[in-house]
Amino acid sequence: MEVKDLKPALIWQCFDEITKVPRPSRHEEQIRKFLLDFAAAHNLAAKTDAVGNVVMTKPATPGCENAPTVILQAHMDMVAEKNNDVKHDFMKDPIDTYIDGDWVKARGTTLGADNGIGMAACMAALIDKDLVHGPLECLFTVNEEIGLEGAINLGEGMITGKILINLDSEDDGEIFVGCAGGIDTTAIFHYRRSVAPEHFHFLKVSVSGLLGGHSGGDIHQGRANANKLIARFLWGLSQEHEVAVCEFNGGNLRNAIPREACAVFGIHGEAKQTVADALDAFAREIQGEFAGIEPSVKFDIESIERPAYCIDSDTSLRLIRALYSAPHGVYSMSRDLPGLVETSTNLAAVKMEEGDTIKVTTSQRSSVESRKFDIAHQVEAHFQLAGAEVSHSDGYPGWAPNMKSPIMKIAAEAYEELFDVKPAIKAIHAGLECGLFLETRPELDMVSFGPTMTGVHSPDEQLNIPTVEKFWRHLELTLAKVAKS
């Protein structure tokens, strides 16, 4: 069986088509054309704004014309992550999907169920002739994964409804009514090139096989950070030997826990075997520390040719110290909602860049606005102590829970009616676009829900098939209840 053959047919057929269209962040041209072609093929009104967001509208079911307009919202872009041994061009290749038991997966890449299944639900709602609903507006935003840019720059008048259902959540049985705000902090190290010592032996050390995951939704899992592990190993070596660091690269995305990292470094030739022994001991140490959490962590080391140059010793030492000691993970838990992470930080990526610079990207989140800035400023101070230039993104606000929300009540009643169990009403430690919509439309009544998926923002991403049917039925009944309210 293929993905397009799954039931309910409409949502799975739409999702299957979406997986064939390249749509990494900042490159939504093809998926936008796909959406506009879809609208034209089904005689749906559609419009775009200056940044490329798309809205499609559908008239109410006959007899429901006076019902309130509902906005269904999802984002177009996907996180483009792949394993190092996988050949895949996210700019032109379709996602290679397959079914494994109750799960839809992708071979060696992110699946894009975040937020492809939300897009598919919007599309299915637009063409389902049996759906009962009031006026519908389906909003597809751009560049959500790199800072919620589509929501930040949403064109005036693009949406008119006062009820919004965000379809970008990842846990069946949970209805979200709040989310964290976020801000990115970037540190730039400038270095001088120094001649690679002739009497040094040069090696490349790497770590792979980590689970990674979403820097909001998975940060509480205590998973290993590839950048931290490589920095820790190099720092340990530097306590006993002179280490000449030539390269350091790890992670890719601000909102993903880094799964892989590597460094090129030199050490006195006679210490070559010492390094191999040290890595073996370090690997055993890490496997013990993360037993039951990181079952597939793998370290590799190989000899390489002497590089043209290394990072100057002063910058090299400051960089390794800063990465090793940088904060990462959960900073504090919510005192109001048990089990909810309040504040966190993610040491997301380290990249060698042009102009003899090294760029360190971090991402901070908090459901308390002042603490969002506090943790960002702590990260700033940390890297300033290491001599880096530090800057912050504009950030985005959180979404404060409204426990008296009418749409929350309707969505909860619909779920319980269908499945004979009360859904959990929650806030999420991740950035949803809802908080940004509230800034310009404070009257909006909003919820977020979706099917179960795990491993998002990593090649381990998978979408649970049975919960997609539940998600669709939940959306159907919620829309019908709003139409009849």
Regions inferred by a protein language model and the residue ranges of each:
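Acidic/His- and Gly-rich active-site-bordering loop/insert found
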Residues: 2-103
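Zn-dependent metallopeptidase/amidohydrolase metal-coordination segment
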Residues: 7-11, 335, 342-355, 363, ...
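A short beta-alpha structural unit
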Residues: 16-20, 264, 298-310, 348-350, ...
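Active-site metal-coordination/substrate-binding segment of hydrolases
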Residues: 64-146, 151-162, 188, 202, ...
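Fold-level recognition of mixed alpha/beta catalytic cores in primary-metabolism enzymes, strongest
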Residues: 136-226, 234-238
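His/Asp/Glu-rich mid-to-C-terminal helical/loop segments that flank catalytic regions of hydrolases
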Residues: 157, 223-240, 267-272, 315-324, ...
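Acidic-enriched catalytic cores of C-N bond-cleaving enzymes acting on peptides and small amides
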Residues: 178, 195-200, 219-249, 269-344, ...
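Active-site-adjacent substrate-binding region
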Residues: 225-227, 232-248, 393-395, 401-444
